A protein has these predicted regions:
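Short active-site segment of divalent metal-dependent hydrolases/proteases
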Residues: 40-44, 77, 112
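Residue-level hotspots within pore-lining transmembrane alpha-helices
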Residues: 35-40, 83, 87
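Membrane-interface helix/loop boundary segments of multi-pass membrane proteins
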Residues: 39-65, 94-101
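Residue-level signature of transmembrane alpha-helical entry/exit and packing/kink sites
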Residues: 25-29, 59-63, 81, 85
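Juxtamembrane helix-loop-helix connectors linking adjacent transmembrane helices
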Residues: 1-36, 54, 125
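Short, motif-level signal for alpha-helix interfacial/capping segments enriched in acidic residues
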Residues: 14-23, 53, 78-94
Length: 125
């Protein structure tokens, strides 16, 4: 019964009113998504992984906790979106731990958002 009430979808196409119309809106979307990617990576990878690693003394636990919080913060994307975001959070976190820099996760995060929120919906029109 519960599973019938939970919508499960990995592909969440933004509503048409959120899809940029015209060059100016695409430029604004680019800037907005760049700020989102940078700020979320600084918070969830740059800050939380370091804090949780200090508290737990374990980088695996820090990565899992940070990714779980990142995922829960995207709860508006329904269950499939939360799972997908959790997986992306793990990938971004692994890249951060591997490279020791936020630059690669920031670029990956921005590209994922821009393709999914701007380019993919524009291609469907």
């Amino acid at each position: 019964m519960l599973f019938r009430q939970v919508e499960f979808s990995f592909i969440n196409v933004p509503p048409s009113y959120l899809v940029p119309a015209g060059t100016w809106q695409i430029v604004l979307a680019f800037a907005f998504l760049l700020v989102v990617a940078i700020s979320e990576e600084v918070i969830f990878r740059g800050y939380l992984i370091l804090r949780f690693r200090t508290l737990a003394g374990n980088r695996t636990a820090a990565l899992l906790l940070s990714s779980a919080i990142f995922s829960i913060g995207h709860g508006y994307q329904q269950s499939g979106g939360v799972i997908a975001v959790g997986i992306l959070g793990l990938v971004f976190g692994l890249v951060y731990l591997w490279r020791g820099s936020l630059l690669a996760p920031m670029v990956m995060h921005f590209l994922q958002n821009f393709i999914g929120i701007v380019l993919f919906p524009l291609g469907m029109q």
